[in-house]
């Protein structure tokens, strides 16, 4: 008998993980500044519950890798996180989630079949990055969902392989006995503003080009034009998010 198709991909989304979401919770001048984004994440978590999702896969654009595609699928993730990039934004943030080693290994196996160099890891000391931790904080505060994190800051990787990894994820979900959501976590255009102008960059685009490109891609998504939107993403400076989007197409 052939493989039974059992699993369901119930939801896929491009999401933000802007670290000021955590600042938004804290007392001070930035309190409430990202409430809209927080509410949006909570809504995605609500929709996932309504759809019966048991596991969320997150493409994390802050997990930098220089060789192969990597899948963090430990049995459990817990700890206290401070961002080494932005310790003044995210400091001492606690987290506690269950992982899904079986699904992570399925993804790696399916990717290898397609010629992609992919590896699944069930390593307690391999921690999550904030591209995963920020959305899970608001979507998954009660540990309702298992979490699988996939590296998406890929420095030497080919778009064709990223596309194959996306295909492998679809194949793995079909072989998985459960219901899955997939999130591409990261901005479209993503360029930090010059340091001396950091304060003004909190609530504005760094460049007009970035604003126009983002609006163009979102328009294409709304029109259902995935081919053209992928081409736009492929030509933006921020390849990590573009690759994550390519994986989820």
Q: Which positions does each model-derived feature cover?
A:
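Flexible, D/E/H-enriched segments
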Residues: 2-54, 65-164, 175, 195-249
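Beta-strand elements within well-structured catalytic alpha/beta cores of enzymes
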Residues: 54-60, 178-186
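Catalytic metal-binding/acid-base residues of hydrolase active sites
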Residues: 62-64, 188-189
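Histidine- and/or cysteine-centered catalytic micro-motif in compact active-site loops
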Residues: 152-155, 185-189
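Non-transmembrane, aqueous-exposed alpha-helical and coiled segments at domain scale
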Residues: 167-175, 180
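Short conserved catalytic/interaction loops centered on acidic-Pro-aromatic/His motifs
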Residues: 180, 191-196
């Amino acid at each position: 008998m052939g493989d039974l198709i059992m699993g369901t991909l119930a939801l896929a989304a491009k999401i933000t993980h802007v670290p000021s979401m955590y600042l938004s919770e804290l007392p001070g001048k930035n309190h409430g500044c990202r409430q809209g984004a927080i509410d949006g994440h909570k809504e995605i978590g609500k929709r996932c519950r309504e759809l019966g999702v048991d596991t969320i896969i997150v493409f994390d654009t802050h997990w930098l890798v220089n060789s192969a595609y990597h899948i963090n699928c430990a049995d459990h993730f817990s700890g206290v996180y401070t961002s080494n990039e932005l310790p003044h934004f995210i400091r001492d943030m606690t987290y506690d989630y269950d992982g899904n080693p079986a699904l992570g290994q399925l993804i790696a196996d399916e990717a290898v079949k397609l010629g992609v160099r992919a590896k699944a890891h069930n390593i307690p000391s391999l921690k999550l990055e904030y591209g995963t931790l920020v959305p899970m904080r608001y979507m998954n505060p009660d540990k309702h969902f298992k979490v699988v994190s996939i590296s998406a800051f890929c420095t030497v990787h080919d778009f064709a392989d990223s596309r194959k990894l996306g295909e492998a994820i679809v194949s793995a979900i079909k072989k998985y006995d459960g219901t899955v959501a997939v999130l591409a976590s990261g901005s479209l255009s993503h360029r930090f503003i010059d340091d001396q102008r950091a304060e003004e960059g909190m609530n504005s685009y760094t460049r007009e080009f970035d604003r126009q490109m983002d609006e163009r891609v979102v328009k294409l998504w709304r029109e259902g034009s995935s081919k053209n939107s992928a081409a736009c993403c492929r030509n933006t400076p921020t390849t990590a998010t573009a690759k994550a989007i390519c994986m989820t197409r």
